[in-house]
Amino acid sequence: MIQMQTNLDVADNSGARRVMCIKVLGGSKRKYAGVGDIIVVSVKEAIPRGRVKKGDVMKAVVVRTAKDVKRADGSVIRFDKNAAVLINNQKEPVGTRIFGPVPRELRARNHMKIISLAPEVL
């Protein structure tokens, strides 16, 4: 469950290291985002010579949450930290590599490019 002011790690090589959620997209009263949801983030920490700079406002897809993700078969999956992948306006990743595992739920949300770049799909 990601809400406003939540800090997330960045799971790609776009140059950002840490971002903060400033808006959950998908309705005016929507409070929380889960795996596969799109949020608006502000870059809080970035590496030098990266594609993005500190202070940039971008969209991101949530790829890992510490809150359980319940599946249809009754199993749950959870991660140690919250993480996101930065995307552009065409919903394509800004980076060229994805770090760490991503859940299968991204496939149902049509984030196929992230699925194909990920080293492991759980």
Swiss-Prot record:
The keyword Transport appears for this protein: no
Tree of life domain: Bacteria
GO cellular component terms attached to this protein's record: cytosolic large ribosomal subunit
GO BP annotation list: translation
Keyword field: Ribonucleoprotein, Ribosomal protein, RNA-binding, rRNA-binding
SMART domains: Ribosomal_L14 (SM01374)
CDD domains for the chain: Ribosomal_uL14
UniProt GO molecular function: large ribosomal subunit rRNA binding; structural constituent of ribosome
InterPro entries, alphabetized: Ribosomal_uL14 (IPR000218), Ribosomal_uL14_bac-type (IPR005745), Ribosomal_uL14_CS (IPR019972), Ribosomal_uL14_sf (IPR036853)
Similarity annotation: Belongs to the universal ribosomal protein uL14 family.
Role noted for this protein: Binds to 23S rRNA. Forms part of two intersubunit bridges in the 70S ribosome.
Assembly: Part of the 50S ribosomal subunit. Forms a cluster with proteins L3 and L19. In the 70S ribosome, L14 and L19 interact and together make contacts with the 16S rRNA in bridges B5 and B8.
Record's protein name: Large ribosomal subunit protein uL14
Organism: Methylorubrum extorquens (strain PA1) (Methylobacterium extorquens)
